[in-house]
Every structure is written in structure tokens, then in C-alpha cells.
């Protein structure tokens, strides 16, 4: 089981189960609730006291960090069952609702999800938008499904901005897996499209964050 070559930074968190106990057939996208780089995002999950992690962090600048290898289960969605079958991705976002992401982060997220699906044998990414239907569905060969943190805990994650883009993400990734090289701008997110990437000076500590 490989990891994405798109990762620009690697810092493995101790917060994980190794190995995962289920094949990868799910993508779970989260909002980080802070405009972090991939490096800073991975650093947040280093203390064992954090009791949380993810497989990848996507930074506001489009950087991608590997935090937990794909062969291992991250601690991300408040559901052991979901985490064992999902690749979890924390995406840099604003710190208030609807938790918008930058255009650079969105583009990197699309690239990363496409790469994950392709390497794990998926030709189609499915978004049902319904917890019961999704959890009852057994992905067929060549399929992966999308789940969200809010289904497993009293959280707003991934925020309405990214949540409203899930259908678009699934369609675009499926299109790319079919051989198309076209890209889609995030036109259906809450309150407009993804923001243009800007430079931030960020000083963050673990206690500052309200991840998920």
C-alpha cells in the first residue's frame, strides 16, 4: 500500500493504529479551522496527548503533508470503523463558518483525492449526501465513497463550504479517473467560490485549534 507522491512534507503522527483493518474504500475530507501549511498541520498532530491525527493535511498554499501512512488508520472522524476504511484529509480553512478554503487548497485537494482513488483502484468516487445510505452501501470494485465527520459526532466538520462541494468533488474526481485532464473551479460552495490563495503569517499552537 503506497502513499501519495504529491506529498511535499512528511511528519508521521504517533496517533494511529497500525495497520488498518479494512481495505481503503472511503474518502473523508475535514476542515482544519486554521489557515495552516501542510508542515504546520502535521506538527499539530505530533503530541500523543492530542489523541487525533489524519492521513494527509492540505495547506492553504497547496502544500500536502503526510501525517499517517495510508496503510495505517488515523484518528480523525470520531468513528473507528470509518477511520479504518477511510483516507482522512484535513484541509486548511478559515476559522469561522462556513470554513472557506483557498483556491490553492481546493486544487491540491482535488489532485490528492484523485491520486488516492487511482492508486487504490477506484474509477468512481461516490457522494450520496446521506449517512444511512452511505453506510449501508457496499462499494463495488472500482468504487470509493465519501463520508463526513458530522455524521459521527456533534460537529460541523467539514463546514458547509466544503460539504456543499462534495458533489462537485466526486464528479470532478470521477471525471479525472476516466482520463479527463480538465479541472473544475469550486463554484457550488457556500457563499461563493474558493478564495484566491494569499500569503499568511501564522502562529498556531495546538490549544489554539478547534479541529473538527
Could you say what each language-model-derived stretch is?
Residues 185-210:
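SH3-family beta-barrel domains
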Residues 33-34, 152, 206-210:
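Short polar catalytic/cofactor-binding loops
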Residues 26, 86, 145-147:
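Structural preference for beta-strand elements that scaffold enzyme active sites
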Residues 2-11, 16-21, 95-193:
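Basic/polar, cationic surfaces and motifs that engage anionic cell-wall
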Residues 33, 70, 80-98, 114-118, ...:
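Cell-envelope and extracellular/periplasmic
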Residues 56, 89, 109:
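Divalent metal-coordination and catalytic microenvironments
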Residues 1-83:
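N-terminal catalytic cores of peptidoglycan-degrading enzymes
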Amino acid at each position: 500500500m503506497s502513499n501519495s507522491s504529491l506529498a511535499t512534507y512528511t511528519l508521521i503522527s504517533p496517533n494511529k493504529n497500525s495497520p488498518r483493518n479494512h481495505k481503503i474504500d472511503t474518502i473523508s475530507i475535514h476542515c482544519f479551522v486554521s489557515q495552516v501549511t501542510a508542515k504546520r498541520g502535521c506538527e499539530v498532530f505530533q503530541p500523543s496527548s492530542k489523541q487525533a491525527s489524519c492521513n494527509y493535511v492540505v495547506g492553504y498554499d497547496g502544500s500536502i503533508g503526510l501525517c499517517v501512512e495510508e496503510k495505517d488508520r488515523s484518528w480523525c472522524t470520531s468513528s473507528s470503523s470509518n477511520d479504518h476504511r477511510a483516507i482522512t484529509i484535513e484541509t486548511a480553512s478559515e476559522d469561522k463558518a462556513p470554513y472557506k478554503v483557498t483556491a490553492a487548497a481546493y486544487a491540491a485537494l482535488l489532485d490528492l483525492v484523485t491520486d488516492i482513488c487511482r492508486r487504490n483502484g477506484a474509477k468512481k468516487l461516490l457522494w450520496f449526501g446521506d449517512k444511512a445510505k452511505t453506510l449501508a452501501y457496499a462499494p463495488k470494485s472500482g468504487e470509493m465513497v465519501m463520508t463526513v465527520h458530522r455524521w459521527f459526532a456533534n460537529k460541523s466538520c467539514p463546514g458547509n463550504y466544503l460539504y456543499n462541494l462534495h458533489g462537485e468533488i466526486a464528479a470532478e474526481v470521477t471525471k479525472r479517473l476516466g482520463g479527463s485532464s480538465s479541472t473544475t473551479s469550486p463554484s457550488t460552495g457556500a457563499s461563493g467560490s474558493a478564495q484566491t490563495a494569499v500569503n499568511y503569517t501564522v502562529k498556531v499552537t495546538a490549544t489554539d485549534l478547534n479541529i473538527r
